[in-house]
């Protein structure tokens, strides 16, 4: 279930958990994202059974070796939510392409909640 790349003189294997770590880091790098949502996205059938799921996110490697991402976040109420979603999509795609060398088919950002400071 790992991502394999043939390179002379051997193979480079990227575990699905590495992809979730990259997605988590790219998502949390945006100042408008307070944290990942505590829920896990519902399980959907995978085309090849490849991918990984972690708290608030899911990464699937499709049959054509492209990647799809679903990430659920809790946002800062002062953030522009539309801009936050677009920037997080771009950050995730760039990080996966640059760090892991995978082609990204889609990144879906779900803003599940905004969190206000309790002292306000």
Model-predicted segments: where are they?
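Contiguous, often N-terminal, cationic amphipathic patches that form binding interfaces
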Residues: 1-81, 86, 102-120
């Amino acid at each position: 279930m790992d991502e394999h790349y043939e390179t002379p003189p051997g193979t480079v294997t990227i575990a699905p958990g590495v992809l979730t770590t990259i997605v988590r880091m790219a998502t949390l790098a945006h100042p408008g994202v307070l944290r990942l949502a505590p829920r896990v996205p519902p399980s959907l059938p995978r085309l090849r059974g490849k991918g990984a799921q972690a708290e608030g996110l899911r990464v699937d490697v499709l049959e054509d070796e492209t990647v799809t991402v679903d990430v659920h976040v809790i946002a800062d109420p002062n953030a522009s939510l539309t801009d936050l979603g677009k920037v997080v999509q771009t950050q995730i795609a760039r990080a996966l392409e640059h760090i892991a060398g995978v082609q990204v088919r889609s990144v879906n950002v779900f803003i599940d909640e905004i969190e206000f400071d309790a002292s306000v």
